[in-house]
Amino acid sequence: MVAGLTSGGLELRIVPLGSSRPLLVLPLETGELFTIHYVHSVENAPIWEVHSVDAEGRIYIEEERYRKFGAGMGRMPGVGRLVRRGEYEVITDMHMPTGDFVLRIGSPGVDHTLVWRGTRTNLSALAPHRAVRFAARKVSFLHQLWRMVISHGATPG
């Protein structure tokens, strides 16, 4: 019984504000990465934001990658390290806590897309113009085991 109550892992839930039904539910391991990819609405250039979740369920931004600084983009003094990867500016080593956060999903064309374990889910196709909360939580070993047998209907792949 005690084993069922101990921590079994993490779960990231992406839920529209005002709803209890998640768009996505992602099982995660401590430190595992997920990415939000979209096209900047002003600059019309691709952006990648790489996030992680720690053992307590706190969300961090780890890296941002883009072609050029655009409106709302850019470096924060004292956070991360700016490098170039080909044509992209990349802020690495950020490990900046965001906690749970709200994202207003853009329209098709902005294509807010969640990338996780080789899957890509276009949030703009699922819920354009909706505000959604990204929230992570610890789950019990029994919950994790259950989800290994029967995945949540909102888990991609």
Walk through the language-model features, giving the residues of each:
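Generic ordered-secondary-structure signal
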Residues: G9, L24-V25, V102, G109
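Generic serine detector
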Residues: S7, S19-S20, S41, S52, ...
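Hydrophobic membrane-insertion alpha-helices, especially the h-region
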Residues: M1-S7
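N-terminal secretory signal peptides
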Residues: L12-K68, G72
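Mature, soluble, non-transmembrane domains
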Residues: I59-I61, M73-G157
